[in-house]
Amino acid sequence: MNGIRDVVKEEQPRERLLLEGAGSLSNRELLAVLLRTGSKEESVLKLSDKILHHFDGLRMLKDATLEELVSIHGVGVAKATQLIAAFELGRRMVRLEYQNRYSIRSPEDCATYMMEEMRFLQQEHFVCLYLNTKNQVIHRQTIFIGSLNSSIVHPREVFKEAFRRAAASIICLHNHPSGDPAPSREDIEVTKRLVECGRIIGIEVLDHIIIGDHKFVSLKEKGHI
């Protein structure tokens, strides 16, 4: 028989998880637990290795589509949907930690709140956090997806949600898929335009945070706000 039961005792992921805890397992072993079984030709650990190699580790795997997963020999629709559901649960659990009126007192607070959700995105996402008078997050909105451009990021879309939510202030964020959070000329121009509009209508743009891979840049700290 194939699957975890066929692997030598010291490499049985489910048994190791029960005895030593999930934290003791490698990425390939955790993936094997989710997959449960291998195929006729290979063990579940070999299948795990193949999947991780195909996606160059967890970074790309977390955003894998159903089509990409089932294209791998040994991964059917059932296994693919199990993985996709597990990854989505993981993302939601990360968000739960910072929900319920998370307070932002510094650029670091803001980056911590959004880092894990945004740093792996493969396209630029422009997101606004809407805050109350106590600097607590009352709403989060993705304004658009795509390359940041002053002609695309219209202040109307940013501030419309602020009025709907009776927000006192806004923090803007977007990610750089390259992992380098250094601001571009367009990033700075968009920021200045939004800040000026905020001054006119009385809703302050507190900061614009650029998210990289475990790095971030605050345009306020850089003197652009």
Swiss-Prot record:
- Database matches in InterPro entries: MPN (IPR037518), RadC_JAB (IPR025657), RuvA_2-like (IPR010994), UPF0758 (IPR001405), UPF0758_CS (IPR020891), UPF0758_N (IPR046778)
Keywords of this entry: Hydrolase, Metal-binding, Metalloprotease, Protease, Zinc
Q: Which residues bind Zn(2+)?
A: H174, H176, D187
Fetch the NCBIfam families from UniProt: PRK00024.1, radc
Q: Name one GO molecular function term.
A: metal ion binding
Coiled-coil region(s): none
Superkingdom to which the source organism belongs: Bacteria
Q: Where is the MPN domain?
A: 103-225
Q: What Pfam families does the database record attribute to this sequence?
A: RadC, UPF0758_N
Originating species: Bacillus anthracis
Task: Name it.
Answer: UPF0758 protein BA_4685/GBAA_4685/BAS4351
Q: Which family does the record assign?
A: Belongs to the UPF0758 family.
Q: Which GO terms describe its biological process?
A: proteolysis
Q: What PANTHER family does this protein map onto?
A: DNA REPAIR PROTEIN RADC, UPF0758 PROTEIN YEES-RELATED
Motif JAMM motif is found at 174-187
